[in-house]
């Protein structure tokens, strides 16, 4: 069954259970969200905030109730409890809160949202002529871990319950962050850019119980050799007419992008540019029409970084793709429990009898999972090369 508790944002210390009558949640590789639904049991129509009746909030006095849900200081943990074990799934800090006589409504800021208000500037180094933060000879996930540390533990009052991992893992990468460029140094933005370069690793935060009274988050990243986050075991799910461990499966299809125009730093005719293209699909006997994209990367004057971002975009969009989505019921013992399967994990999907997906086993990587406080969970997977076009 699902359980929700309040906690302290800085330490992750659990406080008390809180009863939110109706809520929906979602997890992706890099982010998480939780919100109340307008109609209990409806899979559609999420509100932008969580609404809690005062009868569900601990406290006998106005001060106690207000402090239990202090914006910024307090958070919410959603997890799954089964056989006496609680597995946290979603962690977030209480954001802007609005109270009425009957209830209180607030947003829930995920870790990425919190890090969007932190900047990768060394403490005491935001002065004229300050030297940059230079990180070199490291793996991309080690650079990301250092970026996170400087934006949290490296600042007064900056602590968050995050285990950043290995700061010193060797690699061939380097990054330089100048204080004067602070407008482009939001920690969340920097982490996104590390993940989005060609060969960039998956970066994710996964909550866990550090002890019976504290929740923490592990910062996990793929290695330079394998960009995907590791997993303990790979589950097998099945779809076929009338049975199987998953249902309501759909497959979306998308054609290829053959060209990406990328612009970098500079102005007008001096602006740095890079063209990434592969016109193979346009030159087939049965050709695809040309599809182009444009992008901008102005955070650095390093042309190789601009090229890396452009080639990474082309590599992800060039193939004719399809994307699988399905639902599963947690009441089915064949379905992995919350906390056993995470976005970023690989899953083997065994298909038989789907109209446009040939029979066989497909190794898919989970991109997003979502649900409400019931037992139905929706899974969306990374796009894969369309087997009908391969």
Regions found by a protein language model. Give the residues of each.
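Polar/acidic, low-complexity leader/linker segments enriched in S/T/G and N/D
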Residues: 1-27
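Short, ordered beta-strand-loop transition motifs
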Residues: 10-11, 21, 28-47, 95-104, ...
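Short, surface-exposed beta-strand/loop "edge" segments at domain boundaries and coil↔beta transitions
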Residues: 11-15, 56-61, 84-89, 113-119, ...
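Short, flexible N-terminal segments of the mature chain
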Residues: 18-35, 279-289
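Short beta-strand and beta-hairpin "edge-sheet" elements
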Residues: 20-22, 75-109, 348-383
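An acidic/polar, Gly/Ser/Thr-rich interaction patch typically located in mid-to-C-terminal regions
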Residues: 38-66, 239-390
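Surface-exposed cap/loop segments at beta↔alpha junctions
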Residues: 63-166
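Short beta-strand-centered interaction patches in the first periplasmic/extracellular domains
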Residues: 95-115, 164-256
